[in-house]
Amino acid sequence: MADKEKEICGRKPRRLEELNLLDNFLFQEMVSGEEDGAEFCRILLKTILNRTIHKVKVIPQKNIPGVDTDRHGIRLDAYIEEERLADGEELEAEVESDIYDIEPNKVYEKGKILPRRMRYYHGLIDTKLLAAGTRYDRLPNVVIIVILPYDPFGQNRMVYTIENHCVEDASVCYDDGVKKIFLYTKGTEGNPGRELQDMLKYMEESTEENVTNPDIEKVHRFVQ
């Protein structure tokens, strides 16, 4: 995530072996690997979304400029396109690939800052997804996933999933394809799954002691 110069605690520079996957440098090293990076992101998405992820394409540190020269641009840590397959068949031309942005963030952002940042990210991402003359219903789903070592909303939840909805009637279907998922590494409310708990613990403390399943074992080999 851009503007990462302020971390939760002011720390002296650490050696590479002291870094964890929430640290920007190590995370970028992981996602930048031509093959390992895609597999790492596939495992992350599989664990976070709790469903099968067949194949992904990853663009590390994707830069999206502002809409004008004096407007704010953004840098996405891991821009991911999921290739959606139907029952193991080839990718259908009419099926739009879902877009994911995974953002480990150790910067403590108070109040409105984090939600407004995500609003801005979504807006700029969308400007690059729809070619001229293309129908709006071809706009792909976009999910921004933020992984945090602090609780962004104070409810001690490991998972906060944010979607737009009708205020007056929650039963109204409003599928704009926009979703934010905030993951608090230490959250306990909401009965988070064991695999997600273990993965987030490993991301915060990426040591062999926290390797608890085959997926994390594979990620740990990439880290080493």
Where do the language-model regions lie?
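Elongated, amphipathic alpha-helical interaction scaffolds
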Residues: 1-224
